[in-house]
């Protein structure tokens, strides 16, 4: 089971010119015979203009325990991609129940924006 796991994956920059290994949150378990996983980008650069679907994880918060994240971070639920599980470099940790529930509540917000 991989859902709610924070992993390291090669993630493309906005212009797709280069990739960088970054943390991501697995939003699903493996899908289909090719074991694809839907992931959301995690950044340590917390923008001033957060959007409704962003989830902040503070380093000093109990929500950080077990995630493997070492700095304040933001889960960017509007930056999602489907990848083969084989691209996952390694597991960092797992989000707690609170973050998992927040993710489920906020995941549809980018699609509901009118």
Q: Where are the regions that the model predicts?
A:
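Compact nucleic-acid interaction/catalytic patches
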Residues: 17-20, 26-60
């Amino acid at each position: 089971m991989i859902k709610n796991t924070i992993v390291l994956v090669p993630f493309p920059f906005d212009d797709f010119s280069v990739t960088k290994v970054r943390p991501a949150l697995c939003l699903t378990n493996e899908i289909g015979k090719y074991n694809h996983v839907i992931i959301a980008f995690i950044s340590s650069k917390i923008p001033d203009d957060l959007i409704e679907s962003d989830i902040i994880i503070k380093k000093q918060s109990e929500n950080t325990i077990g995630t493997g994240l070492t700095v304040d971070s933001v889960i960017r639920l509007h930056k999602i991609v489907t990848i083969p599980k084989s691209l996952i470099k390694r597991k960092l940790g797992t989000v707690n129940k609170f973050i998992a529930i927040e993710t489920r509540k906020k995941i549809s917000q980018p699609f509901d924006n009118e």
